[in-house]
Amino acid sequence: MKKEEKKDNAQKAKKGKEQGIEYFQDPKNYVNRELSWLEFDCRVLEEARDKTNPLFDRLKFLSITASNLDEFFMVRVASLKDMVHAGYKKPDIAGMTAQEQLDKISVRTHELVVQQYNTYNRSLLPALRNNGLNLIECHEDLTPEQGEFVDRYFREEVYPVLTPMAVDSSRPFPLVRNKSLNIAALLKKKDGDEELEFAMVQVPAVLPRIISLPVTTDEDHNETRNVIFLEEIIERNMQQLFLNYDIVTSHPFRIMRNADFSLDEEEAVDLLEEIEKQLKRRQWGEVIRLEIEDKADQRLLKVLKRELEVNEEDIFEIPGALDLTVLMKMYGLDGYDHLKTPKYTPQPVPALMNDDDIFTNIRKGDILLMHPYETFDPVVDFVRRAARDPEVLAIKQTLYRVSGNSPIIAALAAAAENGKQVSVLVELKARFDEENNIIWAKKLEKAGCHVIYGLVGLKTHSKITLVVRREEDGIRRYVHLGTGNYNDSTAKLYTDCGIMTCHPLIGEDATAVFNMLSGYSEPLNWNMLSVAPLWLRTKFLRLIERETKNARAGNPASIIAKMNSLCDKEIIAALYEASCAGVRIHLVVRGICCLKAGIPGLSENIEVRSIVGEFLEHARIFIFENDGSEEIYMGSADWMPRNLDRRVEILFPVLREELKDRIRKYMELELEDNLKAHVLQPDGTYEKPDRRGKLPVGSQMALCEMAVAAAKNERKKHEQEETARVFIPIESEN
């Protein structure tokens, strides 16, 4: 390090000390969590607006923004409303009360919805029409031939399923299911007085929402595929549902309910049974949001507002089709692959491209898995082989979210049926996966597995599998540790990393983790792993503090960290202090970031970037320079209070230099990304990096290409070895 740099770092360290911890923890130096999350959804929306993306990819991104916003209202907004109802006045990390947050959220979400529908109406629908796919937005725009088609479809397919519901003295306002699409109407009796009556019908979720109409051909013989939404067909035929009435007005509407249920786990006699009860209540929680067409009759809106008990700020008048998550169905229509990013095939893992079994390969050395660039198959194979292997004595695994037809579940059940000791922690409290996890828990119990439902007051979010195997030299423990779920479906869509190892100390720690989960054991110390909520916060703070001390001493100091969210005040304050000491900090944070970056005297040494691309960034990676003796960790935890204090999480080290090199390259690419990255500015906004004079770098695309090249090179190497083995030169007689 140059003399000038050491002097500069010393000055910054002095400045940081002068400011003190109070300055680093001042609310003005933090961003509100909810508003930061909304900025993330805006970054996803940017991908929908980006005309360099294939058209159907843009549909997908817009659908994702809508789905994200639904969950945000059902969980985050609902939670804030609960705080207000309870009279909770304590400010958040940024100094905002719950009501202040709700006020800001209302303004920002209304702006976001306008941006969504501007993208939908002005950009995507015209582009679809230009590519031969015409969405007929209003039933009044149908041609006579199309009208006959949809009327026949209504009579034969839709009418038998519908349940029209009137409201009068004997029939109260119906219970409207969470997220259901409905059509509300005001009716007037034929030949009766002028009094208006309210009625509604739910758009049945059991029927497809996108209905294909006959293809039309223009005078130049160009074919157009025509589609219409189911609610338009129902609205066109509303008169058939209320024969003795005239339809004065009718409009689709949709609601979001509070889905953020809480459990008193101490009082629950049976956790599984209690969660099943709460899931039923989720459909009927407080209404958090009402969506209705923007030209809806105000008399109709008044009835809905009164009966659903919705505040004015929670009403969204929508200039287009409700519930844009339907665009994911449109993305799935056949015949449009040319308008999508070509599907990437996850590549084989080079270290496993041989004839040896999984256990032999792990004994050769730790194996790094990088999904979805490399296939998830080795993780499935690990459990399957263990289930069949007569030398395997026990399998233990934690499950948070799994796929609908999970091969992991099938393998665990088979292992139990084969007489092995199988222990599985199924986290029943995984939000919106509770119902699936209850089903899997019952299936595993039926197969003979010992199923644990989790720890009281904590969610088990760690991703760990332990296989205990009898071998010639004694018992050996094989462990898989990951940053992502044991879900073979999302492993093709999410970026995650994992390690397979038989390191004895990691094996000991893995055993201690499962003993902690299944019994009352709390280890006093750990060999290699750091586990929340016991020690993980302390571990991270010590690692950051070490870099701070190195920087103050003029030694090499830097931090590179990748995660989903960053909103822990104690961690952020430590990062601010490190920055003031001269530590270079590069953060890749996909979603929420409550830290302010690039502010002189606070965070001038911190850069934050978010990558939004074809795959969902989900890995957690932490690199600490440590005065030249670099340490690299991966894990399941973000830097959030819930992960560090209220969940069981695991941080694990990467030990092999060869694997460290790969992770460094991985992170270097993400820090060089100038196509899909967004860089946090001092004012809290995000901007795309300046690409002038630079080659375009897309980290996800580059990592795909690297995985393809690595697998190709490994195949070539094996072919050459095979050729050398088969070809034996004839020795000369001389």
How should these model regions be labeled?
Residues M1-I559, E577, A581, C593-N734:
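N-terminal localization/anchoring segments of enzymes in phospholipid and broader phosphate metabolism
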Residues K569-I572, Y576:
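Glycine/threonine-rich ATP-lid/beta-loop region of ATP-binding domains
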Residues N564:
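Cofactor-pocket helix-loop regions in the catalytic cores of large enzyme subunits
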Residues R584-V588:
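Hydrophobic alpha/beta core scaffold segments
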